[in-house]
């Protein structure tokens, strides 16, 4: 009888250990952070000389800037719709016209800015404006990041102070909140991020102008 009870207890204990191990494995799989990295070109919807456009920290779907001869340009149509409708393109004379209170400014493909680069380009049926030209006549901030694998340009109309936060330990910035979401980039401890939105367990942040969740 004692041997039988010992056998039964051993079986029960073994089953409990197996069940516990299985439950632990399931929980580990469930909460193990994903190490999958996104395809940068697919995520930003830009490659080569294309430049991903962000407006007030939101990626603009279907709109891309262009990197031309070391400078970043924005499509005139988008600039007109989003930030400044006063840039007028004279199709007949292939020139840009901008009307100020006391003068009218003209520019064509031969007009260059302080950088020595053309203020506008005509390519693929689109008129492209140099970012410095846009900021010269528009109350916006423009930052360009053109040395990474995917080029990005950030156009902001808000001048409000930004909420900053320090990253306390090595972390991953993800596409969405949740450990199973794909990783955009790794962030070392003591890095600084801009907090766009504070959620219950995650924050929507910008790091070196890469939009993500942390």
Regions found by a protein language model. Give the residues of each.
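A short macromolecule-binding patch
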Residues: 207-214
């Amino acid at each position: 009888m004692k041997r039988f009870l010992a056998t039964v207890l051993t079986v029960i204990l073994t089953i409990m250990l197996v069940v516990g191990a299985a439950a632990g494995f399931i929980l580990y799989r469930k909460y193990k952070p994903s190490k999958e990295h996104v395809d940068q070109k697919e995520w930003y919807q830009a490659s080569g000389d294309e430049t991903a456009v962000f407006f007030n920290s939101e990626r603009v779907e279907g709109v891309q800037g262009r990197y031309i001869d070391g400078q970043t340009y924005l499509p005139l149509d988008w600039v007109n719709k989003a930030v400044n409708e006063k840039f007028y393109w004279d199709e007949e004379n292939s020139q840009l016209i901008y009307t100020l209170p006391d003068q009218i400014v003209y520019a064509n493909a031969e007009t260059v800015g302080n950088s020595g680069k053309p203020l506008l380009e005509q390519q693929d049926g689109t008129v492209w404006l140099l970012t410095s030209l846009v900021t010269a006549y528009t109350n916006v901030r423009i930052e360009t990041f053109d040395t990474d694998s995917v080029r990005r340009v950030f156009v902001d109309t808000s001048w409000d102070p930004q909420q900053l936060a320090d990253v306390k330990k090595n972390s991953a910035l993800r596409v969405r909140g949740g450990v199973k979401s794909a990783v955009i980039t790794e962030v070392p401890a003591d890095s600084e991020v801009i907090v766009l939105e504070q959620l219950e367990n995650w924050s929507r942040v910008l790091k070196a102008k890469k939009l993500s969740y942390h």
